[in-house]
Amino acid sequence: NGYLAFVHNPDGTPVKGYTGMLQTKAVPPFVPYAKGVKIEWHDFVDQYGNKYPDGTPYNAGKPTEGTLTYPTADVIEPLLPLPADYRVSIESTIGIYGTGLLDAIRDEDIIAEYRRQQSMTGPVKGIPGKWIDEPDGTRRLGKFTWDCSRATLENGPGANALWNVTNVTRKNRPNIYMTPEWLEKQKELGIDVSGLEGPQEEELSMQQYEDFMVWHRGLAVPAARNLDKPDVRRGQELFNKLGCAGCHKPEWTTGEYKPLPGYANQTIRPYTDMLRHDMGEINRGRSRFWRTPPLWGRGLMHKTANHTDMFHDLRARDFEEAILWHFGESEFSREMFRHLSVEERGQLIQFLKAL
């Protein structure tokens, strides 16, 4: 995982003049929107003193015993004016394996899950993304990114990021990703910007782009492991008992999928409802609503990425902390987890590691 940074107003909208995702690099002589992002970590102590009811501290036996921490961020040497109430939020990048299968989930099935949750008693009330007009003229439901701001992979986090993160141009993204205010500031600094205005030379051919998308959609999900072990089976029972499956919906059936027809009508188990949930004020970034992240493959993070940092801003250093950061709609599950025995907490985590 890496970070994306957002310079925004209190309501989550971008500060005027800044791109949706902050860019801190520029090819000389151009000057970036900011020289960098400063991240500071803060201690968090809950109302129980970071201890379970049995007296065991959170993260018992680890170097982080008894602690929970969360990050805040600010920009270093911003180029453009900032309002007094500006904020900087950081969000972790989202793994792109398995996203082709998620793309194949029907919009109507996600809406059906939303309606099911709204009809139920209890705190879990996920909300879907907005309907988005796609470049091909269709209207699709937003389901990708932490705030469901992208509807399809074709116009989604991986494909679009080639342009609005790295500024690689192609036929359907011919212009530099920048704001008029940034361009005007470059002129004020005496920098020749004539080469930036208007369509640019295509750096990525459409054939190369399509090849990339085949790879992107085809990234496989690692198989679940050890599901027949008694502790893992017991952990799965606890996962359901604690209500975790209320948001981390285990199973979907894909619909028709023209980009990769072989993905159609498959039963998949990503453990996400593809909806956004209120995770409490302590988890506020651009908002306090976050899409439920898929859990498949998370148990292999340490082997594949050499870390186990999770959550929208990577504040959770492992599965235990990820559960303990569940507030808002999910706080009742957090409380049930806290009241498990040491053995049961370990069994639940063993199940998560098996996915």
Where are these regions (language model features)?
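Periplasmic c-type cytochrome electron-transfer domains
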Residues: 1-355
